[in-house]
């Protein structure tokens, strides 16, 4: 993911510099601070703009470029859909996570709902591109988060709760499956459990293992989820 972020950041900052006829170094620095602020959720708790609206406003304010201008919007949309898909080189090396498809099948077989809660710091086109690289373009996700449908980034609990509201779910009904020891655990804790499929052993994880383990031992994962759910209700 880090390689993807660097490539995307470099390409977008270069495009902004060319469009605004500004130095690439200065534009890269300004865009970097915008993205840091976006991911750190540095704004008022009453600010209900989507991440995309926040990003567009800050780019115009700090870089002097109006991303909502139809021609400029079209240029970046073209990049996301027609250029970015061909950037998956040896450095990015994005591919399907072993066990991911089997895990999705296990969830489907259990009759459960499934959504993709990926960090919404990229526009929809970029998220869809990454899904294609991961062979998830046709996965039956009920909801996929991106800049345009979220008002906060992970791990802010607001991000998780606003998506659950869209789905009509309560936190105690949900199991997050993720591999990021920080971002995939809502902060502050809002009642959502996490099955952790990354490196390390986060103390808050309801279950830990690889994605392949998750698929193979899905019944054990479900059992751990319900045990924690009952314990929380009794506490």
Give residue ranges: language-model regions.
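Asp-based, Mg2+/Mn2+-dependent phosphohydrolase catalytic module
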Residues: 101, 105, 119-122, 127-235
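Soluble or luminal CAZymes and related metallo-dependent hydrolases
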Residues: 4, 8, 51, 92-99, ...
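Substrate-recognition element of Asp-dependent hydrolases with the DxDx(T/V) motif
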Residues: 80-96, 100-132
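Conserved aromatic-histidine-acidic binding/catalytic patches
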Residues: 1-4, 43-47, 92-95, 115, ...
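A metal-dependent, Asp-based hydrolase signature
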Residues: 22-84
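Short acidic alpha-helix initiation/capping motifs at coil-to-helix transition points
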Residues: 3-13, 48-58, 121-122
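Active-site neighborhood of HAD-like aspartate-dependent phosphohydrolases
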Residues: 1-30
